[in-house]
């Protein structure tokens, strides 16, 4: 058999190219974390892997290998090979990987070669590529200056970032808008997948000739996704650009994000009745998540207004009453908290301005570096 190996020196190229990858690990391993361009076509499913692992601990490697062959043979073996071949027919340049680039990769490569197809496997496997991506995140703050984009809730920071080539949208990677109402309909990635996606975004960013890395001024947690500690620490000392926006525009934007888009998304996913119920649950649960910080009286006031707005929306198909609780939430909760946090970093502020003025300032910042 000819062994075709992709060396660790090519990890960078794999992630930049979005190289199609066949992940041979068991589903339980894949679900904890993998890579965006990978598909899980396991050599062994969870129960098979568990049995082989127990055998390895109790009887050693040779016994475990023999058990693996007895579990994956005949029809089962052919089904696994067919699944790989089907994927390879659509992605003939794909690579294989298992946890460490060991026996599972080698055996799969052998079986595929016997079927007439030679497929390389990645040296070091998942573990090697994962460690490489962790290193990318740890090194990133030292490669170029970080610049933090700040602004009150509803000021349009995400929309602004999407127009900047030097920016990475952390909330997009986390699939969460950052605030207590920031949950999206689709779930957030696992912590490992969040970190892997961040690292790959950093690799792509580093290909550009950018004067800085522009990021939104985030908390340590974006929903349930935690920023890597070293990366977050570097963000806390970054220079700051503050995006300013009129209150009426902020309110209109949040009405669209919290109410119109989420309601539409739930309806499209679940239908009219179940969709509205899920949408109502999303709003009330989001408010409930900050109940302690609001205090009992303010929470109850907001909840009453929100329920009235939901009733009006259900019965009259009008959403204007939602502006009442959004306005109260901004002025009594989000804005004071934002001002308090920004004041602690006041010495780091380089510029304040509107969307247009901030774009112009950043263009000049880029050209002067």
From Swiss-Prot:
Its EC number is 2.9.1.3. Monomer. GO terms for biological process: tRNA wobble uridine modification. Belongs to the SelU family. Involved in the post-transcriptional modification of the uridine at the wobble position (U34) of tRNA(Lys), tRNA(Glu) and tRNA(Gln). Catalyzes the conversion of 2-thiouridine (S2U-RNA) to 2-selenouridine (Se2U-RNA). Acts in a two-step process involving geranylation of 2-thiouridine (S2U) to S-geranyl-2-thiouridine (geS2U) and subsequent selenation of the latter derivative to 2-selenouridine (Se2U) in the tRNA chain. Keywords: Selenium, Transferase. PANTHER family: TRNA 2-SELENOURIDINE SYNTHASE. NCBIfam families: PRK11784.1-3, tRNA_sel_U_synt. Residues 15-138 form the Rhodanese domain. The lineage of its organism: Bacteria, Pseudomonadati, Pseudomonadota, Gammaproteobacteria, Alteromonadales. The active site is at 98 (s-selanylcysteine intermediate). InterPro entries: Rhodanese-like_dom, Rhodanese-like_dom_sf, SelU. Disulfide bonds: none annotated. SMART domains: RHOD. It comes from Shewanella sp. (strain MR-7). Pfam families: Rhodanese (PF00581). This is tRNA 2-selenouridine synthase. It catalyses: 5-methylaminomethyl-2-thiouridine(34) in tRNA + selenophosphate + (2E)-geranyl diphosphate + H2O + H(+) = 5-methylaminomethyl-2-selenouridine(34) in tRNA + (2E)-thiogeraniol + phosphate + diphosphate; 5-methylaminomethyl-2-thiouridine(34) in tRNA + (2E)-geranyl diphosphate = 5-methylaminomethyl-S-(2E)-geranyl-thiouridine(34) in tRNA + diphosphate; 5-methylaminomethyl-S-(2E)-geranyl-thiouridine(34) in tRNA + selenophosphate + H(+) = 5-methylaminomethyl-2-(Se-phospho)selenouridine(34) in tRNA + (2E)-thiogeraniol; 5-methylaminomethyl-2-(Se-phospho)selenouridine(34) in tRNA + H2O = 5-methylaminomethyl-2-selenouridine(34) in tRNA + phosphate. One of its GO terms (molecular function) is tRNA 2-selenouridine synthase activity.
């Amino acid at each position: 058999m000819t062994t075709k190996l992709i060396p660790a020196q090519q990890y960078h190229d794999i992630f930049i190219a979005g190289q199609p990858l066949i992940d041979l690990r068991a589903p339980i391993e894949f679900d904890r974390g993998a890579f965006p361009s990978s598909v899980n076509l396991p050599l062994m499913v969870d129960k098979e892997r568990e049995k082989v692992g127990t055998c390895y601990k109790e009887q050693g490697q040779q016994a475990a290998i023999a058990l693996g062959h007895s579990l994956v043979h005949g029809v089962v073996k052919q089904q696994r090979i067919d699944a790989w071949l089907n994927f390879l027919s659509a992605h003939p340049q794909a690579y294989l990987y298992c946890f460490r680039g060991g026996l599972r990769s080698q055996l799969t490569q052998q079986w595929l070669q016997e079927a007439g197809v030679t497929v390389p496997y990645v040296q070091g496997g998942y573990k090697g590529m994962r460690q490489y991506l962790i290193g990318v995140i740890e090194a990133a703050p030292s490669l170029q200056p970080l610049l933090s984009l700040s602004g009150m809730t509803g000021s349009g920071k995400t929309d602004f970032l999407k127009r900047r080539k030097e920016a990475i949208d952390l909330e997009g990677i986390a699939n969460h808008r950052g605030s207590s109402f920031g949950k999206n309909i689709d779930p957030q990635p696992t912590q490992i997948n969040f970190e892997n996606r961040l690292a790959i975004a950093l690799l792509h960013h580093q290909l550009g000739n950018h004067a800085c890395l522009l990021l939104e001024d985030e908390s340590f947690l974006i929903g349930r996704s935690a920023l890597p500690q070293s990366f977050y620490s570097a963000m806390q000392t970054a220079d700051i650009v503050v995006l300013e926006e009129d209150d009426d525009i902020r309110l209109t934007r949040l009405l669209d994000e919290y109410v119109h888009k989420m309601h539409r998304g739930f309806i499209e996913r679940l239908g009219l009745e179940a969709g509205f119920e899920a949408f109502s649950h999303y709003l009330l649960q989001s408010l409930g998540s900050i109940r302690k910080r609001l205090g009992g009286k303010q929470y109850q006031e907001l909840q009453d207004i929100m329920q009235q707005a939901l009733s009006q929306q259900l019965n009259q198909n009008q959403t204007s009453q939602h502006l009442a609780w959004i306005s109260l939430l901004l002025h009594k909760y989000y804005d004071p908290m934002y001002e308090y946090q920004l004041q602690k970093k006041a010495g780091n502020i380089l510029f304040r301005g509107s969307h247009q003025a901030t774009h112009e300032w950043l263009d000049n910042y880029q050209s002067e570096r």
